[in-house]
Amino acid sequence: MAHKKGASSSRNGRDSNAQRLGVKRFGGQVVKAGEIIVRQRGTHFHPGDGVGRGKDDTLFALQPGSVQFGTRRGRKVIDVVSVDA
């Protein structure tokens, strides 16, 4: 196999697809059970009351309610607080 590049060839031209990470529901927004709140790599945000964590560290609502961001013990935490109408 030749290891020299041929005429007008390139070793570039590849790129990976975006992972579409980030906050999907912001503070004060109303969510239903099962709705994704944050897609993340690692635990930038930790699950609080009414929030579950998937195996890829995705945070999702366990109950319907309003999303609240806060801190607990120096960690960023997300809670889902039930909305009593």
UniProtKB/Swiss-Prot annotation:
UniProt keywords, alphabetically: Ribonucleoprotein, Ribosomal protein
Cross-referenced InterPro entries: Ribosomal_bL27, Ribosomal_bL27_CS
Region feature Disordered, mapped onto this chain: 1-21
One example GO MF annotation: structural constituent of ribosome
Recorded GO CC terms: cytosolic large ribosomal subunit
PROSITE patterns assigned: RIBOSOMAL_L27
Biased composition (Polar residues): 7-19
Source taxon at top rank: Bacteria
GO biological process: translation
PANTHER family assigned to the protein according to its UniProt record, in alphabetical order: LARGE RIBOSOMAL SUBUNIT PROTEIN BL27M, RIBOSOMAL PROTEIN L27
Similarity annotation: Belongs to the bacterial ribosomal protein bL27 family.
Protein's recorded name: Large ribosomal subunit protein bL27
Naturally occurring in which organism (per UniProt): Beutenbergia cavernae (strain ATCC BAA-8 / DSM 12333 / CCUG 43141 / JCM 11478 / NBRC 16432 / NCIMB 13614 / HKI 0122)
